[in-house]
């Protein structure tokens, strides 16, 4: 939709908003609309379903928050006759729902709604919101609060919303508008079933809005959202017709050896001027691993400037996650450089002020997430810088062309001048850090294995080929002392494979201890039990050997007897042959020697019989 510069003034909005909403917008400091707001608010506030695709940081949240509040206000305040009390919403009913793929984004959306609602006049019925996300509270607690507070707007993640709706006390008949934020994610295989089931239970006459920076990735699944003749609103960057990123966002890539990624990251964090930075890691374990390393090594260096690190990942419970995000948002930029170390849990929709720099240690497995990550900076026309590290010596350079086809242009940045002695010094500190606690090395191994699994799940398999991955470089980056046994190790060339997998000086693993006394005591107990078992196994093997030797001797005795039998047989055959040779040459009178023996015995018997007869006389 084309919009002239003058038309972005709120006075020129082609829809008459509630007076209190106009005052709230002015008080919040929004002098003009963004293009996506100018195009979307009139449509969604009226009777149109919308599919909105706009670059990150373009004001999408306010573009649907205002229409939602407008519809709720119309329902609460315009339905009353003069002098009559306003019509209240029935028990167990709500007027609007907003679905979000993550808890953090849902919490942030609620904050946007509440910021506007603060300016609601006191003589009006209070508009209430409720957050429904997993782990923050039980479904039962959510239901009790819902029935007690009677909120008008529910902001939820799909799973918790579906569980909440299963209660007989929850009625969906009054819902007038439904919003799907980050709709491409909500309509992919991980959420689609839950989202479709939720939308099926809503009134057919409701209004529906789908919002995302990459809505086209959802394809035909958007038609399963139950919309009626939706209007598509697409707002692109003016910098280039093919660029999906905002013009104020500069995206660069850096070709670097895997082993030097962390030292390069540290140098970037030192050298760049920024207030807040988000660093994306591939897995939850890697966030925990490197967060601990940076706290101990980087912040422990007296020569460094002051850094404030935060850890945020999907394995954290909901309350710590929201608390961490709030602490990072509220961080005083005058005192420290603030660095959030996170996964894709903070890739979508999160709007944090003063984020000037985004660094990706590795590209995401889903190319659509790449732009969402980068979009955490360069928001609301503010200049932002995003950097992605690509593994040198691989085909990952093709990722640049791959993303350009998808409308994301990147520029190569020169490799930072990294002092080899500084790199070696960090590696020495990292090794000492590992040797101080066996538990650290176990986390390092989990991080390394998790990264390998992560790498094999890349959608662009022709670019990210795990057969050619620099496994040794990655292992050194994670600080491993020794390579773990895993199938992928077969891709390491034999010439490069270290002896017995050791990446440095071998150590005695039996003496490699935990820093935690309880863990170490348990390890020693298991080690002692294992030694006892080994001794018992050795004794049992020795007994079996003796038993096997006795059986072997018995076998030899049997073999000796067999040899004697065969010797006797040969001797007997020789006697037979001799007798045959001594027999008469007359072939007709040849007599078998056995017959002769029998005959002689018979004669003796007969003679004995006759002697006996004569004796009787």
From Swiss-Prot:
Concerning Gene3D superfamilies, the annotation shows: P-loop containing nucleotide triphosphate hydrolases (3.40.50.300)
Q: Where is the composition biased (Polar residues)?
A: 608-617
Record domain Helicase C-terminal: where: 261-421
- CC per GO annotation: 90S preribosome; nucleolus; nucleoplasm; preribosome, large subunit precursor
The alphabetical list of record keywords is:
ATP-binding, Coiled coil, Helicase, Hydrolase, Nucleotide-binding, Nucleus, Ribosome biogenesis, RNA-binding, rRNA processing
Which major enzyme category is it? hydrolase
Q: Which residues form the Helicase ATP-binding domain?
A: 41-233
Question: What's its EC?
Answer: 3.6.4.13
Localization of this protein: Nucleus, Nucleolus
GO biological process terms, semicolon-separated: assembly of large subunit precursor of preribosome; maturation of LSU-rRNA
Q: Where does ATP bind?
A: 54-61
Q: Does the keyword 4Fe-4S apply?
A: no
Per UniProt, the short sequence motif Q motif occupies residue numbers 10-38
Q: Which reaction does it catalyse?
A: ATP + H2O = ADP + phosphate + H(+)
Where is the short sequence motif DEAD box located? 181-184
What note about domains is in the entry?
The Q motif is unique to and characteristic of the DEAD box family of RNA helicases and controls ATP binding and hydrolysis.
How does this protein assemble?
Component of pre-60S ribosomal complexes.
Purpose of the protein: ATP-binding RNA helicase involved in the biogenesis of 60S ribosomal subunits. Binds 90S pre-ribosomal particles and dissociates from pre-60S ribosomal particles after processing of 27SB pre-rRNA. Required for the normal formation of 18S rRNA through the processing of pre-rRNAs at sites A0, A1 and A2, and the normal formation of 25S and 5.8S rRNAs through the processing of pre-rRNAs at sites C1 and C2.
Q: What is this protein called?
A: ATP-dependent rRNA helicase SPB4
* UniProt organism field: Scheffersomyces stipitis (strain ATCC 58785 / CBS 6054 / NBRC 10063 / NRRL Y-11545)
Q: What is the lineage of its organism?
A: Eukaryota, Fungi, Dikarya, Ascomycota, Saccharomycotina
